[in-house]
Amino acid sequence: MTHYHSEYYSEVEKFEYQVTHVTEQILQEQDRLRGSTLHEYNQTILQLVSDYEMFNSNGQCDPSEINLPLEKLESWTNSLKQIHLELESIDNFLRYAIPSDQTILNLSKFNESKYETLQAEVSELRDINVVQLQKEIESLQQQITTKSDENLLISEKIKESCLEASQDIDQCWKLLEQLEAYENANPSTEVITTTDPAFSTYNQWKWNQLAESELKHINQQLITLRATKEKLDKVFSKRSELETSPKSIETFTSYQLLSQLWRSKFIRQLLPDIANLEVYPQSGKLKFEVGIMQVIMQIESGIIKSVSLFSYELSYDRIETIKEDILGRIEHQKSLFKVLVVITDYIVNSL
């Protein structure tokens, strides 16, 4: 089946492959660490059994039957190591501390002062070297423990991130399926293709913002028209009670003639590029078109407050650039006619 948005499918498949690869690496590393810990645990037990006869065991252990958390296994391994060291220390102590007859005879011949000197040297060696080495060992053990905890925490975070990414990818697949179903149900919909899906999405988002702004403008015009309609309805409802003033008729006729004269003589002759000119006196807006560009001007007390540009054939960034250049050119301009000339000429020369 041919997909309308094959580039989106390719991107999602690429991300899915990367997340799957990272997840497999994390799981393999955890299995390797678990197997290494179980092997060390088994070897420690075998060493204890072979060294000490007090353990009545054949020394066989199947790590696969052990179903314990990795942290507890590590704690047990450390405890077994500590017991092993303590037993070795006791063995060495008993071996050298319990004297034989020959040892007692030799000790009786020792010079007490020499013995005290040797004892002082041993104490000094123990206090200086052994204690220092013990501190270094404890420091290294602490560093190893800290790094192990950090690695475990990082591994857990990576697993959580992979899980969240997998859920997001599943959501992407669902959205793509919904999009395909919608486009299959609406074959007349124009398919937008691009080599860069990120740019296409960004550009569509900008156009949505532009369309939303235009919708707000149209809603404002609708509110104004409704208010005008309500006022006209009130006037027409009382039409029988009103007497038409000849002066009012003359003023209205003059306004209509002046408006037609302005459109036909001034605008069409002096500014032929302007089309579909519309004036909204109540809202103070002036709307017209120049080529593919639609221009809306907000005028208050004879001062131009804002200029908005719309076009479905130009990109959002291009429209914003033209708008900024126009605002810079009319910033200190007070004549409405000159402003129209500047806007018209710049748009015509830019397109």
Curated annotation (Swiss-Prot):
Parts forming coiled coils: 124-153, 208-234
Example GO BP: homologous chromosome orientation in meiotic metaphase I
Compartment list: Nucleus; Chromosome, Centromere, Kinetochore
Main location: nucleus
UniProt keyword terms in alphabetical order: Centromere, Chromosome, Coiled coil, Kinetochore, Nucleus
An annotated GO cellular component: kinetochore
InterPro entries: Kre28
Disulphide bond pairs: none
Family affiliation: Belongs to the KRE28 family.
Record note on quaternary structure: Component of the KNL1/SPC105 complex composed of SPC105 and KRE28. Part of the ten-subunit outer kinetochore KMN network that includes the KNL1, MIS12 and NDC80 complexes.
Function of the protein: Acts as a component of the outer kinetochore KNL1 complex that facilitates microtubule-kinetochore interactions and the spindle assembly checkpoint. Kinetochores, consisting of a centromere-associated inner segment and a microtubule-contacting outer segment, play a crucial role in chromosome segregation by mediating the physical connection between centromeric DNA and spindle microtubules.
Protein name as it appears in the record: Outer kinetochore KNL1 complex subunit KRE28
Species of provenance: Kluyveromyces lactis (strain ATCC 8585 / CBS 2359 / DSM 70799 / NBRC 1267 / NRRL Y-1140 / WM37)
Organism lineage string: Eukaryota, Fungi, Dikarya, Ascomycota, Saccharomycotina
